[in-house]
Amino acid sequence: MNTERAQEGDRNDAASSSGCSESYEFSHAAAKAAVAQVCESVGYENFKDPALESLSGFALQYILQLGKTATSFANLTGRSQCNVFDIILALDDLTDNNGEQGISSESCSLGRSIKLREIIDFVNSSEEVPFSQPLPSFPVAISDRSRKMIPSFVEIGETPPGKHIPLWLPAFPDPHTYKETPMWIERVSDPRGDKIEQARQRRKAERALLSLQRKLVCKISSRNPVWGDMDGVKEEMRDDESELRSVSSGEKVESLNRDGLSVIEAFAPAMEAARDGFSSEAHTEWKKNKPVALSKLRTEKKFLGQPLDLSLQMKGEDRPISFVREEDRDDKRRRAEFILRQCMENPVDLNQL
C-alpha cells in the first residue's frame, strides 16, 4: 500500500515538474529501462511491476532533485544553463544532506569530490550494456509524412495583410475560420425610411387611441348624463321644478275643492308636514344658515367634446337635482305651516272653507 502511494506521488511530482504528459511518459519509460538493466546486472532474474515502478519513481526523483540543485548553482553564478561543475556540486550537496562528507570546506578542488570518484570507479570497473532497444532523442521528432507544415505567404503567393508581417511566416488560415460572421444578411440602414416608418407607426397608434376614446365616451354618455354637458343638466333641472310646481298647485286646488270635511281632516297632511318640520327645525335652520358653496364653472380642455376629468365630474352629477328637491320640500312645509296658522287665527275664513 505504501509503495503504491509513493508510486503515485512520484508520478504526480514528475508530471508537475516536466509540465507535459508526453515528457513524463518518455522519462518514466527510460527510467524503467535503466532500473531494470541495473537490477539485472546485480543478479535479479525477474521482478514485479509494482517494485519496478517504485524504483523508477525513486530514480526520477533523485535525477529531478539533482537537476534543480545544479540549476540553482548555475543561477548563483549568473548563468542560465548548468555545466558539469554544477552537476558535481549538486551531487556533493545531496551527499551532505544525506549525512556523508562531500567536498571539504578547506579545499574547493572538484577533483577531490567523493561522488565524482565513485562515479569514475564505477565507469572504469563495469562494462557498458546497451539497452535492448535504442532510446530516441527527446523530444521525439515527427516524421515528415505525419507532419503538416503550414505553407508560407511566398509558397501560396499571397501578400501579408500588414507590412510588418514578413513573407516567410506561415500564412493565415481562411478568414471564416477565425472571424465571426453573421448568419443573416445585414440590412442597409436608411435613416429617412426609418423616420417615415416611425411616423406611420405613431399615427397608427394615435388612431387606435382615438377610436378607443370615442367608444368609451359614447358608452358612458349612453348610460348616464355627463356633468360637462351643462345644457342637458339645466333642462333636467327646469323639468323637475315645473313638475314640483304643478304638484303643489294641484294639491292646493284639491284641498280647496273639498266640501263637507272637517278642519282636522282637511289639514291633516299639513299638520303632519308641520310636525315633521318642527322635529327637524334645528336641522332646517342649520341648512338655512349654512354658507353656500359657490362652484366656479370654468372651461376645460375637452377631448372629442368631453372633459378630461370625466370620472370626477360623474361623481357629482346627481348633486344639483337632489338639492332642488330638498328646497322644494322645505317650501311645501313652510306653505303648509303658513296656511295652518292663518286658519287658526281667522276662524271666519275657516267657516267659509
Swiss-Prot record:
It comes from the Eukaryota. Its main location: nucleus. Keywords: Activator, Nucleus, Transcription, Transcription regulation. InterPro entries: BTP, Histone-fold, TAF8, TFIID_su8_C. One of its GO terms (cellular component) is transcription factor TFIID complex. It is found in: Nucleus. Expressed in roots, leaves and inflorescences. Pfam families: Bromo_TP (PF07524), TAF8_C (PF10406). GO terms for molecular function: protein heterodimerization activity. The keyword Transcription regulation applies. The keyword Transcription regulation applies. Residues 30-103 form the Histone-fold domain. TAFs are components of the transcription factor IID (TFIID) complex that is essential for mediating regulation of RNA polymerase transcription. Belongs to the TAF8 family. Component of the TFIID complex. TFIID is composed of TATA binding protein (TBP) and a number of TBP-associated factors (TAFs) whose MWs range from 14-217 kDa. Can homodimerize. Interacts with TAF4B, TAF5, TAF10, TAF12, TAF12B, TAF13 and TAF14. This is Transcription initiation factor TFIID subunit 8.
